[in-house]
Amino acid sequence: DPRLTLRKAMSGGGDFSALVRRDRVVRHPPVVALCDISGSMTDYTRVFLHFLHRLTEDRRRVETFLFGTRLSHVTRALRARDIDAALADVSGAVQDWSGGTRIAASLHEFNRLWSRRVLGQGAIVLLFTDGLERDSDGSLAAEMERLHKSCRRLIWLNPLLRYDRFEPRAAGIRAMLPHVDEFRPVHQLASLEDLALALSRPALRADVDPRHWLRRAGG
């Protein structure tokens, strides 16, 4: 159970090694993670990959993709049982760590090549990015809309929500917000615990409703 694992990690100084499982067998919907590994996300990527590694062990149907300036499919690497080995395999499979970001282009590649293969059976998409897009051709909104229509739930995880005075002013953020079901922080273990709970018991809270932020953005 990822939520109980995170609780143990919080009480044990960040140790993710003990995965807590529940006896009751639950058939979870597929989870597809799209993770921004650009320079602006560096401080958060490793912790989120730890979370995905445990989620991959706990659930049968988890697919993970990383993107900076290109899209990389790293599901097989994350299936290594040892977390250090898994992260080493992921690092070896990706060439654009901590560089620039092209969100629209990466989503276009996913939508074109992978969407039909991994988004069936009510899949939940976890989009891990700050939304600071560098492309300016206006395609981001269209790619987000296509992604949203292809999945059951699209959850945007944005570390910028750690700021009390955060405002959705950046063009990329404004383009993406209308096409997500939940808008969540992802800057600490407590926020990942909330995410684990949301994956198990979906219920939209007011504080993660994107409509709140759309109103603030004037959308």
Region locations from a protein language model:
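Extracytoplasmic/secreted cell-surface and envelope-processing proteins
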Residues: 135-138, 194-195
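Structural beta-sheet core signal
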Residues: 33, 64-66, 127, 156
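Structural motif
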Residues: 30-32, 122-126, 153
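Metal-dependent catalytic core segments for phosphate chemistry
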Residues: 21, 43-46, 50-102
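Short acidic, Gly/Ser-rich segments with clustered Asp/Glu that frequently serve as metal-coordination loops
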Residues: 32-46, 71, 132-135
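Von Willebrand factor type A / integrin I
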Residues: 144-219
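Negatively charged sequence features
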Residues: 1-29
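Von Willebrand factor
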Residues: 84-123, 161, 165-168
